[in-house]
UniProtKB/Swiss-Prot annotation:
It comes from the Eukaryota. The lineage of its organism: Eukaryota, Metazoa, Chordata, Craniata, Vertebrata. The keyword rRNA-binding does not apply. It is found in: Mitochondrion. Allows the formation of correctly charged Gln-tRNA(Gln) through the transamidation of misacylated Glu-tRNA(Gln) in the mitochondria. The reaction takes place in the presence of glutamine and ATP through an activated gamma-phospho-Glu-tRNA(Gln). The gene is gatc. This is Glutamyl-tRNA(Gln) amidotransferase subunit C, mitochondrial. One of its GO terms (cellular component) is mitochondrion. Pfam families: GatC. Its main location: mitochondrion. Keywords: ATP-binding, Ligase, Mitochondrion, Nucleotide-binding, Protein biosynthesis, Transit peptide. GO terms for molecular function: ATP binding; glutaminyl-tRNA synthase (glutamine-hydrolyzing) activity.
Length: 188
């Protein structure tokens, strides 16, 4: 039984119970684990508790930011990009860097990523997965509502024979010569 359904059966209004469960509050009835019924506890007595993973109680999350700006002296020198490399980046990312503003944005993004070169990673093993050493607690798969395929298909823009239709794939950008012909009066 879901916590929301349990809380509403125990006398909480649906609106209040859903607000509590969305805030991460667990609802228990007296002694026992969350969601268990006990006959000794009146229906109106509920213990509402917040999990210990709240920000105030989590010791792994620092209370203040630990980020410090990196001086420009420690960063590698700024790289100049040949036109061929910019064309390749445009084709792969499907982003247009035709203007000076686009190139400046690209240079700033690369300069920001250069700060990773300063990080000391000696003695740190590479991580294959974020969840590699953790136990994953999964809930049981319970069907909440059934026969809602028609409702879900109505949410899609394109359907064909009760299947979702994916949008068209990436459209490649025109070559540099074609773009040069199109943009004779551009700043780039």
């Amino acid at each position: 039984m879901s916590v929301l359904r349990f809380a509403t059966r125990r006398g909480l209004s649906w609106c209040y119970a859903s607000r509590l469960t969305h805030q991460g509050t667990s609802v228990t009835s007296g002694e026992g684990s969350p969601g268990t019924r006990t006959s000794r506890v009146p229906a109106r007595v509920l213990n509402l508790t917040r999990p210990l993973s709240c920000r105030a109680y989590n010791s792994k999350v620092p209370q203040s930011p630990t980020w410090e700006p990196v001086s420009e002296d420690l960063l590698p020198p700024c790289a100049q990009f040949p036109a061929d490399l910019v064309d390749k980046l445009e084709r792969l990312a499907l982003v247009d860097f035709r203007t000076k503003q686009g190139l400046e944005c690209l240079e700033k993004a690369i300069r920001f990523a250069d700060q990773l070169h300063v990080v000391d990673t000696s003695g740190v093993e590479p991580m294959d997965s974020v969840l590699e050493d953790r136990v994953l607690y999964l809930r049981e798969d319970e069907e909440k509502e059934g026969d809602c395929a028609e409702e879900l298909l109505q949410l899609s823009r394109n359907t064909c024979e009760e299947y979702y239709v994916a949008p068209p794939g990436n459209i490649p950008l025109p070559t540099r010569e074609k773009r040069a012909a199109m943009l004779k009066h551009s700043e780039f």
